[in-house]
Amino acid sequence: MPLSPILDELGTYPFARLDEAKRRVAARGVRVLDFGMGDPGEPTAAFIREALADGIRETMGYPRAHGLPELRQAIAAWCERRFGVALDPEREVIPTLGAKEAIFSFAQVVLDPDRGKDLVVTTEPGYPVAERGARFAGAEVLQLPLLERNGFLPDLDAVDPALWRRAAVVWVNYPNNPTGATAPLALYERLVALAAEHDFLVASDEAYSELWFDEPPVSALQAPERTRLVVFNSLSKRSSMTGYRSGFVAGSPEVINALRVFRPSVGTAPQEFVQRASIAAWSDEGHVREARERYGRKRAVLLDVLARKTCRVAGSRATMYLWVEVPGGEPSDAFAARLLEHGVVVAPGSYLGPSGEGYVRFALVPAEEECRLAARVLEEVL
């Protein structure tokens, strides 16, 4: 049967394996406290759900691929309030069905093998969707390691200039999943300069931009030049709206125009009632502050027990994740399996890339009381 060989090369999505192991433990009657997947367990704010319901009409046709003008305006207004960046909602913003599908398909928009632009650069450990989308699009992929000694930032000086010249797009993700690291504006400025020198695009996945605990992170949109830069963001983590599938791409007018041409062939914007809910979400900050406070309380519970058990937390300045060094040099999957036997699910760092070995990721998605239960388990097991 003619199936893509990429399917075999990539293998099973690692978190599918984690789900299978979790089900086996639950079947034994063990209470499972799931810190494995980054799917917020908090309810979506009532006013957002009301906006969703109010947006449902008797007849709902296909949504416009470019999204409602009001949604593009709400996104542009949020970017200006949050980052001090003025965007043209007609030329520099396009809504998407969350961030995942847009990230996955982006390589199809930017690869140009006839010009030698056949390389996609990503980072690891990290969210695997950009890499997988690039491989399905036929690209070669270069993954830059994010190492603790470099502050979990890519070492751009280690890349051969010949590879930069082949790059169609360079992906970064800050605040970073899984390390929780944030990036200085200087990183984006350097990438934009390299992009101008070597003719590639910079794509910044900023899905965790609003989950921070000290200082609000900067955005790549704040770089002085956006001609070769686009940002992907989403309401999934910011507003606990993972199931709504609502996000956006913003930045380079030329790239946004290319997406306007491409996207009607592969999908559309979110349904109109989801867009109405999204307008409400992007227009409000109160529910986001409340979410940060909840995550902060859960974070404090785990930080306390991990510190008492001398488990070192690395990075973890933002996002909903704690990036924890595995004690005693134990392999990350073995350590995660040991915790799972006691009902605490964490993601082995090796699932997220070779440089993730030696760490595990705690996603702060269980309720605060469940975090306290997990802390008691960790107190006994570690």
Label each residue range with its predicted role.
Residues D118, E197-L201, R226-T227:
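A short helix->loop->beta-strand "cap" motif at the edges of active sites that frequently abuts
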